[in-house]
A protein has these predicted regions:
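Gly/Ser/Thr-rich loops at beta-strand to alpha-helix junctions
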Residues: 49-51, 149
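Short beta-strand scaffold segments in enzyme catalytic cores
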Residues: 44, 51-56
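Nucleotide/phosphate-binding catalytic cleft detector across ATP-hydrolyzing
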Residues: 1-43, 59-185
Length: 185
């Protein structure tokens, strides 16, 4: 039987949120892999359908985070909710002062998301320092997700891109729960 990442599954993290059942399993899986690989206080960003930001301490406390619309959802909203804006391919344009609508939309979507990322990460770092006593310079920022490569060159706060973070986290959770699953079967 498949292993479902849900409440009760061993992760090695201590979930410090109001209702742990509300935390998406993808966020937990990414946090498990990042905490396993890096023993620093962490901010894990997943550039997927939504862009999620998660804070994890070096002791494995999952503190919570922020959820923003992903770049593709934002592009879809512009196309579907405006009268004349076209569908655009997601590409990093060369300029922010754009001479046409398509490049203007691409600029707003990509550079806007880069700015959102920098702002949220900076705010989370400040909270980790002020509310949790973490050393600002020790906080490592890990990014993953299909759209991470698109923003990596423009987002200075990202320390490393981990393309396999979710898969690595699933393997780690499977290993932590393997013996428990054998007893049930």
């Amino acid at each position: 039987s498949p292993l479902v990442v849900e409440t009760g599954v061993k992760t090695g993290l201590k979930i410090k949120c109001d209702d742990p059942r509300q935390i998406g399993s993808d966020r937990i899986v990414n946090a498990v892999a990042a905490h396993h690989k890096y023993k620093n206080p962490l901010i894990v960003i997943d550039f997927g359908t939504a862009t999620t930001f998660c804070a994890i301490t070096e002791d494995g406390d999952y503190l919570g985070g922020t959820i923003a619309p992903g770049i593709k959802i934002s592009a879809k909203a512009l196309f579907e909710q405006t009268a004349k804006l076209p569908h655009v391919d997601l590409e990093v344009p060369g300029n922010m002062i754009c001479k046409n609508t398509i490049e203007g939309m691409q600029s707003g979507l990509v550079y806007g998301h880069m700015g959102l990322t920098e702002y949220i990460v900076e705010g989370m770092k400040k909270e980790l320092v002020e509310n949790y006593g973490k050393d600002y310079d020790a906080i490592k920022v890990i990014a993953t997700g299909g759209l991470a490569p698109m923003v990596e060159n423009g987002v200075k706060c990202i320390d490393v891109i981990e393309k396999r973070l979710t898969l690595d986290g699933l393997v780690l959770i499977y290993e932590k729960n393997k013996s428990q699953r054998k007893k049930r079967n």
